[in-house]
Swiss-Prot record:
The PRC barrel domain binds ribosomal protein uS19. Residues 89-156 form the PRC barrel domain. Belongs to the RimM family. Its main location: cytoplasm. GO terms for biological process: ribosomal small subunit biogenesis; rRNA processing. This is Ribosome maturation factor RimM. An accessory protein needed during the final step in the assembly of 30S ribosomal subunit, possibly for assembly of the head region. Essential for efficient processing of 16S rRNA. May be needed both before and after RbfA during the maturation of 16S rRNA. It has affinity for free ribosomal 30S subunits but not for 70S ribosomes. Keywords: Chaperone, Cytoplasm, Ribosome biogenesis, rRNA processing. GO terms for cellular component: cytoplasm; ribosome. The keyword Cytoplasm applies. GO terms for molecular function: ribosome binding.
Amino acid sequence: MSSDRPIVLAAIIGAHGLQGEVRLKLFTEDMGAYRTLDGAGRSFTLKTIRPGPNGAVARFAEIGDRNAAEALRGTELSVPRSALPPLAPGEYYHVDLIGLPCLVDGAPVGVAAMVEDFGAGDVLEIEKPDGKRFMVPVAKAVTIEPDRLLIDPEFVE
């Protein structure tokens, strides 16, 4: 995987107040660890971030008023893959699983389409060749290898 590949950490979902703050939908647990983010062909310098409704409220140095904040609605904010912290053995980033082939007893059953966390652990959504999708619990049903995911047959529809 390219270390320069952009990884989306948040999306601007709207303006907050009159001073240029934005509401963010977060895809990371520690947004404050990243001071410079890219989006819409620009760089943004994170000044402050705090919990907010459905995510967080942030102030960026480059966004000075509500109009500028509203204009960025829908903008995805990313960092290079190389900016993410290193992983311990057995850990993974959700983005690293997306697109990997999924196999059951050596036979392909689909491709990893999405990873969700509903609170009890990660759940992998697999898309079959016919476009139908099914979900399996990562901790109980998935063995993660560098270039593929091995799925326990008991969890396959």
